[in-house]
Amino acid sequence: MSSRFALTIVLLSAALFAGCATKPHTTLEMTWVTPQLPQAPFRKLLIITVANEELVQIAFQDQMAAQLKAHGMNGVASHRYFTRYTEAEKARFRRSIEESDADYVLLARVTRTARESREDQVMNVGDATGLYTTYDRYVSVARSAGDYSTKTITAEASIFAVSGEKMIWSARTRTANANVTTGEHFAPQYVAVILEAMKKDKLL
């Protein structure tokens, strides 16, 4: 084997490895489910999102709703996107739910962490378990999440009963190298992981 040919192989291998290493990759970190899941199927599951980028929210809501319907669940994109914490936005959030006639809400939020392994501004599941108190926490985290360069996205999707405003299920995911893609292209693998988590916990 000539030295030039060997060098070419090495360079191609390095390029392939670098390409794989920088592709976004979503994994499920954990889930929590109430010991007493509702026996009746969800009549209408409203999808609402909180993140610092609306494009991510649009892609997630539309794709999640389509996939839920494909699995026999009436998932409905709210087409309401939240990035700021003001009293007006909090009122709009509550109004979006009240006007939807949904019996359950899937509330998803995306936060970003620094390139280091620390989890700056990541909210633990259980920090807030009420539907509207969780919104308060999510928005405060989402706003600070865009203040620095990122490499990893930590996201949580939680389902709440509108009656009683209690959380019945939650999942946390982590997407490495999320900064190399867009919301539209990030959403499919994130949605797929959430769906598998819902199946695992017998929500689908």
In which residue ranges do the predicted regions lie?
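Short, low-complexity, polar/charged sequence segments that are solvent-exposed and flexible
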Residues: 64-69, 95-96, 124-129, 176-179, ...
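C-terminal/domain-edge helix-coil "capping" segments
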Residues: 20-43, 52, 138-204
